[in-house]
């Protein structure tokens, strides 16, 4: 892992965009994995800004979302396909049909999940995946206790995740779906590179477990320790419980002189 710790969320977004542009310059038709939630919002805004400035084109890009709720209407504002279109896809030149997400509405959810996993493989795999983290250490909707080798599957959302996400549903946990379709940890690990973003004190325990703890089902994001290309971008609050924070800062500074 390459770990950067910063005071400014705008700087985090800029650095994350820099990494994605590196991939774009090497491969203009790259495959982009997209996360939802609050963590990547500034990154997506920065990518839109750079598109408008002529620094990147999404004309040859295909995207694959990490996850989708089950049980929401297709046009629900908080549906993840709608989130991605609203915050990125509809604001750049990505062609119609190039943005993909898990199907949370099909009659056979498990078959749909397996088909999504195969679609990613058929498209050559994800070149760079954007990731955030839940307060319980989940990535995608891979909750604690699941297998570390899972593929895209139907999952059950924990009470903690539903409480965390209630802020997107007028604070009402009863409006938050109980199920989802999510890329599995094995699917996520197949991505060639990752950009991981975490901000805020509420993520500090999960960040510490992911980086400095053992690899365990209790903290699903810890599996990223086994991936060869993960760029971790944190603010001071999210990094506040890291015992080796000063070391990570020193290494980052020396590598980015």
PLM regions: where:
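A glycine- and small-aliphatic-rich helix-loop capping segment at beta-alpha/alpha-beta transitions
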Residues: 46-57, 80-82, 144-154
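ATP/nucleoside-binding phosphotransfer catalytic cores, i.e., glycine-rich phosphate-binding loops
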Residues: 186, 190-257
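N-terminal glycine-/serine-/threonine-rich phosphate-binding loop
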Residues: 1-32
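A glycine-rich beta-strand to alpha-helix segment
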Residues: 30, 38-39, 43, 119-144
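Class I SAM-dependent methyltransferase SAM-binding "motif I" and its flanking Rossmann-like core
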Residues: 136, 140-185
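Glycine-rich N-terminal segment of FAD-binding domains in flavoprotein oxidoreductases
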Residues: 26-52
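Short beta-strand segments
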Residues: 33-37, 65, 102-103, 130-133, ...
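Ligand-binding beta-strand-loop-alpha-helix segment within the catalytic cores
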Residues: 56-129, 246, 251-256
